[in-house]
Curated annotation (Swiss-Prot):
Its main location: cytoplasm. NCBIfam families: EF-Tu (TIGR00485), PRK00049.1 (NF000766), PRK12735.1 (NF009372), PRK12736.1 (NF009373), small_GTP (TIGR00231). Residues 136-139 are annotated as: G4. Keywords: Cytoplasm, Elongation factor, GTP-binding, Hydrolase, Magnesium, Metal-binding, Nucleotide-binding, Protein biosynthesis. This is Elongation factor Tu 1. InterPro entries: EF-Tu_GTP-bd, EF-Tu_GTPase, EFTu-like_2, EFTU_2, G_TR_CS, P-loop_NTPase, Small_GTP-bd, T_Tr_GTP-bd_dom. Residues 60-64 are annotated as: G2. The gene is tuf1. Belongs to the TRAFAC class translation factor GTPase superfamily. Classic translation factor GTPase family. EF-Tu/EF-1A subfamily. GO terms for molecular function: GTP binding; GTPase activity; guanosine tetraphosphate binding; translation elongation factor activity. SUPFAM superfamilies: EF-Tu/eEF-1alpha/eIF2-gamma C-terminal domain (SSF50465), P-loop containing nucleoside triphosphate hydrolases (SSF52540), Translation proteins (SSF50447). Mg(2+) binds at T26. It is found in: Cytoplasm. Residues 10-204 form the tr-type G domain.
Amino acid sequence: MAKAKFERIKPHVNVGTIGHVDHGKTTLTAAISHVLAKTYGGEAKDFSQIDNAPEERERGITINTSHIEYDTPTRHYAHVDCPGHADYVKNMITGAAQMDGAILVVASTDGPMPQTREHILLSRQVGVPYIIVFMNKCDMVDDEELLELVEMEVRELLSEYDFPGDDLPVIQGSALKALEGQPEWEAKIIELANALDSYIPEPQRDIDKPFLLPIEDVFSISGRGTVVTGRVERGIVKVGDEVEIVGVRTTTKTTCTGVEMFRKLLDEGRAGENCGVLLRGTKRDDVERGQVLAKPGSINPHTTFESEVYVLSKEEGGRHTPFFKGYRPQFYFRTTDVTGTIELPEGVEMVMPGDNIKMVVTLICPIAMDEGLRFAIREGGRTVGAGVVAKIIA
């Protein structure tokens, strides 16, 4: 069987289900798959196929995730669903599945529960930009007022974490009844799909973002100057463009005088490509691995930031013992390790392997960063944690 060609006709959007255990995330995922396949065509996935999530490894961390795809008339969606709470924590922090928007599932029989809050907080910390609410199990609640109360609670909780609780879409439905093919509840799934289409804006493609290339290597070519190599993370660099060298040292400006790939000269290097960029008047010693080449003014170097961190368990090859304040590991950003110190939240004395925690990190030298940047925590080259920059402080 020939591999199906990936057709890039419609815009592609990444979403996922979040919410408390047993509130119906996987049932909703199956219901979306079925109802949209029935309505707009495509392949339907069963609950058991989704629930039986395969193990993946992302930066050495074991995560169980199910990936399904579905279409609406205007878009193609890739949807992730995780079986366990720990899988969500790891998934969101490592960025294994970056979400352009999330569907928060809340059982109307329960209302918001501890993991509801935790997933909203995580979404805020890791930069999930949009949340849509699906109130599930509404077929089991006869009281209109109770449904209104739950909706109000969910909206208030979202507002508490700086999401637009008053304005975001809330759909009241029943994933199970939709899956069983009851038309009034199937209609609610279509309503949810319409909300995804209209509420989550089309994501900006990497190629349309400002140019950034993490520097992996630096060469000096006699008679031509200095070449830096790496994979373009986003944007495009053209011959003649002004670029900045950011991070580790004082930011400097230079000009790209050539781009080459596989020993061929090109006019430009684009997102996703491995290339060498020739820099005008830059000495071999002015640049080093760990810096980035970027569009001037698009990214700044920082040393102190608040982060959300997942600490690997012993089984994942992490530490066997907790760490305390004063811990000084290496923080691996893009291509390089930088030593840093940590500050734990008030009242937290130690962090155990397998925990997730908010911490403030101060690096010994500045790194080019934006909120949402992922990093690994390492000790002697071994990964012991994964994190994401939640808020830049300095």
